[in-house]
């Protein structure tokens, strides 16, 4: 899930629609609401955030420090002004990257992945996706590949696979996966749907790989395990 902070509801709603077409869930806040949320959000919820996108708002320079107090996810600022000085000020405030409008959400996703690669937060990564054993994921709306061949998946299963690979080495519980895929405020979907998605994903991976790469432990959660 990506958190978008902007003074304008029209902008946060627009990002929700655009990212949604790529299978990415977003949650939008005004700066005031974001301050209250980031102060009180439970640890397991904020750990499900994949990135923060800071749009035009009066507190644009202050927000990166607030985010860093709670989370290490990539922070990207959207610069509406064609000003070098403003761009430099945004970098000095602690953002990981600055993009200028107009920008496609796929470029934003690619920049998020590049930040993760530089931070060493993912598995073996290159300019074109993240490789874990025979599996390559892209996190930009494209289907994953297994041994270089496209491996089409429904959107939710694809996002779960991407999230597990992005968090290789960590065991993720059902709540964390649900929050990352559906958003932390989605009350219309039951968390148990995660078990159904993962069951289907495991069956497909087992059929393609000849083994099940997703390890599960009751009460502890799931992790992807490929040597």
From Swiss-Prot:
PROSITE patterns this protein is in?
OMPR_PHOB, RESPONSE_REGULATORY
Q: Which UniProt keywords apply?
A: DNA-binding, Transcription, Transcription regulation
SUPFAM superfamilies reported for this sequence: C-terminal effector domain of the bipartite response regulators (SSF46894), CheY-like (SSF52172)
Disrupted-gene phenotype = Inactivation of the ftcR gene down-regulates the activity of the fliF promoter region and the production of both flgE and fliC proteins during vegetative growth or during macrophage infection. This mutant also lacks the flagellar structures under growth conditions in which the wild-type strain is flagellated. The mutant is not attenuated in cellular infection models but exhibits a marked virulence defect after 4 weeks or more of infection in mice.
InterPro entries in the record? CheY-like_superfamily (IPR011006), OmpR/PhoB-type_DNA-bd (IPR001867), Sig_transdc_resp-reg_C-effctor (IPR016032), Sig_transdc_resp-reg_receiver (IPR001789), WalR-like (IPR039420), WH-like_DNA-bd_sf (IPR036388)
DNA-binding region as annotated in the record: 127-226
UniProt superkingdom: Bacteria
A GO CC annotation recorded here is: protein-DNA complex
A Pfam family for this UniProt protein? Trans_reg_C
A GO molecular-function descriptor: phosphorelay response regulator activity
Share an example GO biological-process annotation for this protein. Answer: regulation of DNA-templated transcription
Q: Which CDD domains does the entry link to? A: trans_reg_C
Boundaries of each Response regulatory domain copy? 1-116
Give the function comment from the record: Required for transcription of the fliF gene during vegetative and intracellular growth and for production of the two flagellar components flgE and fliC during vegetative growth. Specifically binds to the fliF promoter region. Could mediate the action of VjbR on flagellar gene expression.
Miscellaneous section: There is no cognate histidine kinase partner identified so far for FtcR.
- According to UniProt, the name of this protein is Flagellar transcriptional regulator FtcR
Q: Which gene encodes it?
A: ftcR
């Amino acid at each position: 899930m990506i958190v978008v902070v902007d003074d304008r509801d029209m902008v946060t709603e627009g990002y929700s629609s655009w990212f949604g077409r790529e299978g990415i869930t977003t949650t939008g806040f005004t700066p005031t609401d974001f301050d209250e949320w980031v102060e009180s959000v439970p640890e397991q919820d904020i750990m499900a955030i994949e990135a923060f996108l800071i749009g035009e708002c009066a507190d644009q320079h202050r927000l990166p420090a607030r985010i860093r107090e709670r989370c290490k996810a990539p922070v990207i600022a959207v610069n509406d002004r064609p000003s070098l000085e403003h761009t430099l000020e945004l970098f000095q405030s602690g953002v990981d990257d600055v993009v200028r409008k107009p920008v496609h959400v796929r470029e934003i996703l690619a920049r998020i992945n590049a930040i993760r690669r530089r931070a060493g937060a993912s598995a073996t990564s290159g300019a074109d996706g993240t490789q874990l054993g025979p599996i390559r994921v892209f996190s930009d709306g494209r289907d994953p590949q297994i041994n270089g061949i496209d491996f089409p998946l429904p959107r939710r299963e694809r996002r779960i696979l991407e999230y597990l690979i992005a968090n290789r080495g960590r065991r993720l519980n059902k709540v964390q996966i649900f929050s990352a895929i559906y958003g932390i405020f989605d009350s219309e979907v039951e968390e148990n749907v995660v078990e159904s998605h993962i069951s289907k994903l495991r069956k497909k991976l087992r059929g393609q790989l000849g083994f099940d790469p997703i390890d599960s432990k009751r009460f502890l959660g799931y992790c992807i395990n490929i040597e």
